[in-house]
């Protein structure tokens, strides 16, 4: 998504499956040795989500026009909400350093290094502003990954801000409380319409 504002290009990017080759939520999810002994493995939550998603898709029925597609995207929010509320406890007691240790496992899209260089040139000439808008669970993870990738490619990290959900932490600590909250004081970004709303807010 891109638009021109005051002769400067505003570039709004997705993260999972766009900048990266694959979804990165499995890297944000804690390893078995990082969770409480009685916590289920992340795959259990993935299976429960897929059951909810499949049931919702079946009940919604076939999509034959644009209005039905918009309704589908709005309605699926309840599936995403249920999934996040279910998974909250999985992150309790984990920290950013643990997630940061898995950044090296991210596979970026071919051409991303060249894209970083292109963005850095245009930001330096004040002709570009770039942001990420994502349904991901950790803006800190994304920000750390972008910085590490830019350093590896020898360019400056110029994406101004990552608008994504965040794992809440205890005051004065990076220890996670278990809650997943929206960016800043905003509601959580869970669906396509949520992302569109955020993009419009950034562009306004």
Model-derived features: where do they sit?
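Short, Lys/Arg-enriched N-terminal segments with co-localized hydrophobic residues
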Residues: 1-3
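Alpha-helical substrate-recognition element adjacent to the catalytic core
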Residues: 5-166, 170-171
């Amino acid at each position: 998504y891109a638009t021109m504002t005051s002769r400067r290009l505003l570039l709004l990017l997705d993260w999972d499956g766009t900048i990266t080759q694959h979804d990165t939520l499995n890297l944000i999810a804690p390893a078995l040795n990082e969770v409480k002994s009685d916590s289920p493995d992340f795959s259990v939550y993935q299976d429960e989500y897929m059951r909810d998603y499949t049931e919702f898709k079946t009940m919604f029925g076939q999509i034959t026009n644009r209005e039905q597609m918009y309704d589908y995207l709005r309605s699926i929010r309840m599936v995403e909400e249920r999934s996040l509320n279910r998974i909250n406890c999985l992150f309790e007691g984990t920290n950013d350093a643990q997630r940061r240790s898995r950044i090296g496992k991210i596979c970026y899209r071919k051409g991303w290094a060249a894209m970083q260089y292109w963005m850095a040139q245009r930001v330096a000439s004040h002709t570009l502003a770039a942001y990420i808008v994502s349904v991901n669970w950790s803006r800190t993870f994304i920000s750390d990954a972008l910085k590490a990738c830019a350093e590896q490619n020898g360019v400056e990290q110029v994406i101004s801000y990552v608008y994504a959900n965040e794992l809440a932490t205890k005051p004065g600590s990076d220890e996670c409380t278990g809650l997943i909250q929206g960016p800043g004081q905003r509601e959580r970004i869970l669906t396509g319409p949520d992302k569109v709303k955020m993009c419009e807010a950034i562009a306004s």
